[in-house]
Design a protein with these regions (language model features):
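Alpha/beta enzyme core
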Residues: 23-39, 83-86, 130-143
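Glycine-rich phosphate-binding active-site loops on the catalytic face of alpha/beta enzymes
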Residues: 94-100, 144-153, 196-218
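Conserved, mostly hydrophobic/aromatic
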Residues: 20, 40, 84, 140, ...
Length: 228
């Protein structure tokens, strides 16, 4: 994939779990070198929910050639990462709000496997949480909702956060760090976020997995709206 290309990361948490396998195959068939699989891992502690664990994500990874975009909403990612079969083709994002020792240990594990390292920031989290790790970062995931559950309304204070982050990264001379957005990424909102500087769009219930249109059609519409 091109470094600054616009990418759709399909949130499998938002898919129908009973048709997950065939939907992954459908995504592969409609890939224009601009798709990833977004895999949410939660521990019931950092967020008050449970989703996929390493066994499930490893099984999903075994049936696809698409890159995987792991989002760990957990307090101790260093205890999850060794059990996960991510590779150099994948993105692995942990949260900036966990303790420093966990972040540092996780960076070591992720970088040793050659994967891309990311930090997520919650709606109220300051960019300063990112600063100690800028030299390691490949991606920053901007949460537009409080993490934990699909289908939430966007937090209004995040509406201009991508533009602000892009400016902040430019000032720090880290222009090549990718910006991803997650939560409430509707088609209309994706267009604005793309113009503001977002590179990766997590497609969930607002933008990709819709009951009234096919997955293929949703992809076509979302693609058109993130191209600038």
């Amino acid at each position: 994939m091109e470094v600054m290309k616009k990418i759709i990361s399909a949130s499998l948490m938002c898919d129908n779990l009973l048709t997950l396998k065939q939907d992954v195959f459908e995504l592969e068939q409609n890939n224009n070198d601009d798709l990833m699989l977004h895999l949410d891992i939660m521990d019931g502690h950092f967020v008050n929910n449970l989703t996929f664990g390493p066994d499930i994500t490893n099984a999903i990874q075994s049936i696809t050639l698409l890159p995987c975009d792991y989002h760990l909403m957990v307090e101790t990612p260093s205890s999850f990462l060794p059990r996960m079969k991510f590779t150099e083709n994948d993105y692995v994002t942990i949260h900036s709000e966990i303790n420093k020792e966990e972040i540092e240990e996780s960076i070591k594990i992720i970088k040793e496997r050659g994967a891309k390292f990311g930090l997520a920031i919650n709606p109220e989290t300051s960019f300063e949480f990112l600063e100690p790790y800028l030299r390691y970062l490949d991606i920053v995931l901007v949460m537009l909702v409080n993490p934990g559950f699909a289908g939430q309304n966007i937090v209004n204070s995040t509406l201009d956060k991508v533009k602000q982050l892009k400016h902040w990264l430019n000032e720090k001379q880290y222009q090549n760090i990718l910006i991803a957005v997650d939560g409430g990424v509707s088609v209309k909102r994706a267009n604005k976020l793309s113009k503001d500087g977002a590179n990766i769009f997590v497609g969930g219930t607002s933008g990709l997995y819709k009951k009234d249109i096919t997955l293929k059609k949703s992809l076509e519409i979302l693609r058109k709206n993130i191209k600038i």
